[in-house]
């Protein structure tokens, strides 16, 4: 939610930012907000003036009663003032509702470094890491997508897609999951289950070392938390509601972590608050018909380890760089080649002022795919959830800034590991950093093994 003071003092900045985002229909909202706000403030001023007048009359009534003088005329006048105040208060309340309707539906103000664009095609790669394995048939596309800034090894054999590897390795059952739950669900099996859990513990351990407090949040939250954390459109496209309850299944641990300190004034000395949340995530994926229908890349349910930061406003941009670097370090240790992308205005979403994605190179698919998103939401969520801080009790509270980043979404990390660490025969080598968590160094095709996890 935007600060009404920003709109009052710099409406052109807000209009220009909406233009950058391609939200042309909402530009006219700013003039409407200013008009409503002027009416609201004028009526508040009138209310305060009437209250002052009523107080003066009350004092005069007291004086007259002491003297035994008549007060009927003053009492009648006081009653008229009370009626007028009550009427104005209703008008003020209605005006506030109208203003809030607009404020709650305006996107965050973008950072100057966010590239202007219309879609994901306009996102800007800013750095690359790792040595990619590239099938010769994908080489031209890889060179274009990597801008010639990545090392690579050309493969004469064609790498398999993760969905085919899962079948070869006995790692998932999609047919039975579809029977039980429908599309975009899965049973994970055998070593892939161990790999999923290993990724969670690996990411958790790495972030605890960096000072993050581990949290298993509630998997369901009330509507006010979702309204405070995300946009209203997500209620239709992303979020599952529990029928008959004021509860929603979380699409990410970000949301319960954002709501954790709702309606609180934090002690400034405790900032930044660093949390690492571990949870399942539930998503409708309503707007993705036809995309990634096979496999585990885009599914209704998955596990995720999430970084969440409450920071001082003046420190949030530094923390944004830190949390994306934290995620990069995880993927470097998993030996996954990737690029970091600065998300453009048209693909940014409403909540973030700036967002980075990590896109892992997927040899089977022959393209980079998103595995991490890291956002600085500045005070957009904090205003909606009323999360403030102060350094002294006599100081006016200020809104915190909130930031979030994927550490690891296990399903997508598994896709990246399978496609990047596969051998020609379908064997998948486990990244060395995970050995102590998995207890095995590779996963071999079903036809080559007797049972799960045998040495």
UniProtKB/Swiss-Prot annotation:
Disulfide bonds: none annotated. One of its GO terms (molecular function) is ATP binding. It catalyses: tRNA(Ser) + L-serine + ATP = L-seryl-tRNA(Ser) + AMP + diphosphate + H(+); tRNA(Sec) + L-serine + ATP = L-seryl-tRNA(Sec) + AMP + diphosphate + H(+). It comes from the Archaea. CDD domains: SerRS_core (cd00770). Keywords: Aminoacyl-tRNA synthetase, ATP-binding, Cytoplasm, Ligase, Nucleotide-binding, Protein biosynthesis. It is found in: Cytoplasm. L-serine binds at residues 252-254, 306, 406. GO terms for cellular component: cytoplasm. GO terms for biological process: selenocysteine biosynthetic process; seryl-tRNA aminoacylation. InterPro entries: aa-tRNA-synt_IIb, aa-tRNA-synth_II, aa-tRNA-synth_II/BPL/LPL, Ser-tRNA-ligase_type_1, Ser-tRNA-synth_1_N, SerRS_1_N_sf, SerRS_core, tRNA-bd_arm. Pathway: Aminoacyl-tRNA biosynthesis; selenocysteinyl-tRNA(Sec) biosynthesis; L-seryl-tRNA(Sec) from L-serine and tRNA(Sec): step 1/1. ATP binds at residues 283-285, 299, 370-373. Its EC number is 6.1.1.11. HAMAP family: Ser_tRNA_synth_type1. Belongs to the class-II aminoacyl-tRNA synthetase family. Type-1 seryl-tRNA synthetase subfamily. Homodimer. The tRNA molecule binds across the dimer. This is Serine--tRNA ligase. The gene is serS.
């Amino acid at each position: 939610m935007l600060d009404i003071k920003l709109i009052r003092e710099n409406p052109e900045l807000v209009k220009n930012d909406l233009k950058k985002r391609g939200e042309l229909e909402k530009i006219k909202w700013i003039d409407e907000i200013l008009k409503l706000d002027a009416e609201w403030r004028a009526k508040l001023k009138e209310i305060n003036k009437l209250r002052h007048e009523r107080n003066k009359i009350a004092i005069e009534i007291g004086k007259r009663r002491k003297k035994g003088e008549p007060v009927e005329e003053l009492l009648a006048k006081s009653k008229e003032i009370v009626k007028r105040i009550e009427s104005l208060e209703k008008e003020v309340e209605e005006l506030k509702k109208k203003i809030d309707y607009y404020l709650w539906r305006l996107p965050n103000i973008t950072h100057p470094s966010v590239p202007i664009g219309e879609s994901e095609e306009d996102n800007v790669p800013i750095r690359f890491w790792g040595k990619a394995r590239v099938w010769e048939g994908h080489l031209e596309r890889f060179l274009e997508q990597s801008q010639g800034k990545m090392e690579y090894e050309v493969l004469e054999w064609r790498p398999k897609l993760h969905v085919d590897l899962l079948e070869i390795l006995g790692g998932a059952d999609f047919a039975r999951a579809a029977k039980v739950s429908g599309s975009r669900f899965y049973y994970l099996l055998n070593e892939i289950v161990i790999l999923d859990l290993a990724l969670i513990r690996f990411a958790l351990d790495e972030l605890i070392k960096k000072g993050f407090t581990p949290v298993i949040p509630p998997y369901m939250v009330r509507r006010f938390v979702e309204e405070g954390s995300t946009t209203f459109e997500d209620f239709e496209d992303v979020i599952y509601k529990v029928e008959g309850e004021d509860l929603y299944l979380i699409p990410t641990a970000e949301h319960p972590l954002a709501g954790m300190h709702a309606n609180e004034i934090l002690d400034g000395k405790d900032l930044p608050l660093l949390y690492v949340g571990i949870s399942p995530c539930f998503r409708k994926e309503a707007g993705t018909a036809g995309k990634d229908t096979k496999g585990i890349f885009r599914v209704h349910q998955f596990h995720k380890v999430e970084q969440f930061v409450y920071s001082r406003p003046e420190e949030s941009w530094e923390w944004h760089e830190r949390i994306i670097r934290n995620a990069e370090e995880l993927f470097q240790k998993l030996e996954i080649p990737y690029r970091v992308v600065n998300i453009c205005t048209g693909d940014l979403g409403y909540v973030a002022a700036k967002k980075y994605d990590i896109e892992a190179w997927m040899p089977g698919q022959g393209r980079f795919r998103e595995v991490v998103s890291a956002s600085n939401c500045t005070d957009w969520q904090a205003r909606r959830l009323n999360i403030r801080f102060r350094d002294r009790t006599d100081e006016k509270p200020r809104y915190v800034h909130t930031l979030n980043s994927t550490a690891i979404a296990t399903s997508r990390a598994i896709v990246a590991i399978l496609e990047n660490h596969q051998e020609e025969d379908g064997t998948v080598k486990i990244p060395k950093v995970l050995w102590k968590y998995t207890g095995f160094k590779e996963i071999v095709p079903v036809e080559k093994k007797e049972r799960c996890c045998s040495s």
